[in-house]
């Protein structure tokens, strides 16, 4: 399949899946088609505010299967479907990505060559506010060349995005 055909197919898939997945409260973050021998792999990444659960990914998988089974968009060649969450390895490219990662640590490469690592404090449609070394910095998205969420094993629990749940049992247990 040529690159132009593949782009058209991705666009058609996204158009067919957009409304059914929005009905589940999910946004399509990426559609990828990769050749794998005589088959293709169709990967659909979904997300929503607060992140997606495994049950929501399973429900999205069933819905994508239902829609594609009733469509000709994938043609006759067999394919394997993978529905996933967005994942932390994908760059933050849209305002909703910044909003959904409030409280997380990000590494930002700026268009002018500078770089910074800071925590997302707030964001809107035009800019993000970061805490960089204790200093609040407002950054317009237009200034950002690339931004990636950093994986933290000991993430602070008193910042934005913290729900206050430490994962422990709030009820007293019996001995």
UniProtKB/Swiss-Prot annotation:
- Keywords recorded for this protein, A-Z: Cytoplasm, Ribosome biogenesis
Q: Where is the composition biased (Acidic residues)?
A: 160-175
Q: Where is this region: Disordered?
A: 152-175
Q: Which Gene3D superfamilies match?
A: RimP-like superfamily, N-terminal (3.30.300.70)
Q: Which family does it belong to?
A: Belongs to the RimP family.
Tell me the protein's name.
Ribosome maturation factor RimP
Keyword Lipoprotein on this protein?
A: no
Protein purpose? Required for maturation of 30S ribosomal subunits.
* Species of the source: Nocardioides sp. (strain ATCC BAA-499 / JS614)
Gene of origin? rimP
Q: Does the keyword Membrane apply?
A: no
Query: Where does the record say this protein resides?
Result: Cytoplasm
Organism placement in taxonomy: Bacteria, Bacillati, Actinomycetota, Actinomycetes, Propionibacteriales
Query: GO biological process annotations for this chain's record?
Result: ribosomal small subunit assembly; translation
Q: Where is the signal peptide?
A: none
* GO cellular component entries: cytosol
């Amino acid at each position: 399949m040529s690159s132009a055909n593949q782009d058209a197919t991705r666009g058609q898939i996204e158009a067919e899946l957009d409304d059914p997945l929005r009905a589940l409260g999910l946004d399509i973050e990426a559609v990828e088609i990769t050749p794998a021998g005589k088959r293709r792999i169709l990967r659909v990444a979904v997300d929503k505010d607060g992140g997606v659960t495994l049950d929501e990914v399973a429900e999205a998988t069933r819905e994508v299967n239902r829609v594609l089974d009733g469509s000709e968009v994938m043609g006759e060649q067999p394919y394997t479907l993978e529905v996933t969450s967005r994942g932390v390895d994908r760059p933050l490219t849209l305002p909703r990505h910044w909003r959904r990662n409030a409280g997380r640590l990000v590494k930002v490469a700026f268009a002018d060559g500078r770089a910074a690592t800071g925590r997302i404090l707030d964001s809107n449609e035009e800019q993000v506010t970061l805490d960089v070394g204790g200093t609040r910095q407002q950054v317009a998205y237009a200034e950002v060349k690339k931004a990636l969420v950093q994986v933290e094993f000991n993430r602070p629990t008193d910042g934005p995005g913290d729900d206050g749940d430490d994962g422990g049992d709030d009820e007293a247990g019996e001995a």
